[in-house]
Amino acid sequence: MAYVRLACLAVIFFFAASVMFTVEAGIPCGESCVFIPCISSVVGCSCKSKVCYNNHVIAAEANSVDDHHLLCQSHDDCIKKGTGNFCAPFLDHAVQYGWCFRAESEGYLLKDFLKMPKALTN
């Protein structure tokens, strides 16, 4: 009787493993993001309409910069939206929008501090 239980458990395990590898290879960002953010954000996924999509898919299907909070066409768009200070374009030139990042470099933070005043007032 123990062998029958182990055999059933082994069949279920192999079935679950094969389904997992099939889904993983086909849809890298297939999970839902209704209550929690995208778990697969490490591989370049973001939440749109309660489903996780690849970032370049979101940018390619967008009609305007306002379709997603991380889409941009210039660094000023990122700063205005408050989602970063650097707009990085995608390598695919057919995608007309970029993706906002927060670039925290020492030079960027000190650029306004090191400016000389235009006129000295006493």
Swiss-Prot record:
Disulfide connectivity for this sequence is 29-45, 33-47, 38-52
Q: Which UniProt keywords apply?
A: Disulfide bond, Knottin, Plant defense, Signal
Identify the InterPro entries for this entry.
Albumin_I_a (IPR032000), Cyclotide (IPR005535), Cyclotide_bracelet_CS (IPR012323), Cyclotide_sf (IPR036146)
Cross-link Cyclopeptide (Gly-Asn) lies at: 26-55
Q: Which Pfam families match?
A: Albumin_I_a, Cyclotide
The tissues in which it is expressed are: Expressed in seed but not in root, nodule, flower, stem, shoot, leaf and pod (at protein level).
Q: Which SUPFAM superfamilies match?
A: Cyclotides
What positions belong to the pro-peptide in this record? Answer: 56-122
Might you name a Gene Ontology BP term for this protein? defense response
Q: Where does the record locate the signal sequence feature?
A: 1-25
Explain the post-translational modification. Answer: Contains 3 disulfide bonds.
Q: Which residues form a coiled coil?
A: none
Q: Which PROSITE patterns match?
A: CYCLOTIDE, CYCLOTIDE_BRACELET
Q: Which family does it belong to?
A: Belongs to the cyclotide family. Bracelet subfamily.
Give the comment on domains.
Answer: The presence of a 'disulfide through disulfide knot' structurally defines this protein as a knottin.
Give the protein's biological function: Probably participates in a plant defense mechanism.
Instruction: Give the protein's recorded name.
Output: Cliotide T8
Organism this protein belongs to: Clitoria ternatea
